Regions:
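Alpha-helical cap/lid subdomain in secreted, periplasmic
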Residues: 27-190
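Serine-esterase "nucleophile elbow" of acetyl-processing enzymes
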Residues: 1-13, 30-34
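Cell-envelope and extracellular/periplasmic
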Residues: 12-16, 45-46
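Structural motif
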Residues: 15-27
Length: 194
């Protein structure tokens, strides 16, 4: 029986969005060398773009200077404020739906262009689309639907460039990953990662 040997290197960073991927990860010489040697490249980017936008939207709607450490913290503040003013939920949905996707798309294109230029001939690229990271959080259903619409639009951007950059999209949006998250309710646990 022939043995198959492999090496896995994980460059993931908590909180990293698409701009951070381009500015911090894909400028690192070690990462670039690793990408150039890899037979298979897995990419998961985008959820933090959404979560950061959510935090900014809540900050704007609540008219606060509070720097939320997480989307969960921002949503908790929104929930508490919405208890006295339910119209705040509608404001956040409206704000999220007006999000300008152009920056995410520009970052995505830049990232894929860089990786495409670094990878060796014949290397596979597999990207995950975005699941609903707030599905397990206690938020109003109308807001959850607004978040899902934003995610669908982001996933369309990811899928739009698959052929151009030769990558496959692993559909985690339709998976049960939301059933397997860490205590923060956002990030997949070990089972969710698998």
């Amino acid at each position: 029986e022939e043995e198959f040997q492999y090496e896995i290197t994980n460059y993931a960073r908590n909180g990293l969005d698409s701009a951070g991927m381009n500015d911090k990860i894909l400028t690192d010489e070690e990462v670039c060398d690793s990408v150039g040697r890899s037979d298979v490249i897995f990419i998961t980017v985008g959820s933090n773009d959404l979560l950061n936008e959510c935090k900014s939207a809540v900050q704007e709607i609540l008219d606060t200077d509070t720097k939320f450490k997480s989307a969960g913290e921002a949503l908790k503040a929104l929930r508490e404020s919405a208890a006295g003013n339910p119209l705040l939920v509608l404001k956040i949905i409206e704000t999220l739906e007006q999000w300008d996707y152009q920056m995410f798309e520009a970052n995505w294109i830049e990232m894929m262009h860089r990786i495409d230029g670094m990878k060796k001939e014949g290397a596979w690229i597999i990207v995950t689309n975005i699941y609903n990271p707030v599905a397990n959080l206690d938020i109003p259903s109308t807001m959850d639907r607004g978040v899902e619409n934003v995610i669908r639009n982001m996933n369309q951007i990811i899928e739009k460039y698959a052929e151009e950059y030769g990558y496959q999209v692993a559909d985690i949006f339709s998976s049960e990953v939301c059933d397997h998250v860490q205590p923060d309710g956002l990030h997949p646990d070990q089972t969710g990662q698998q």
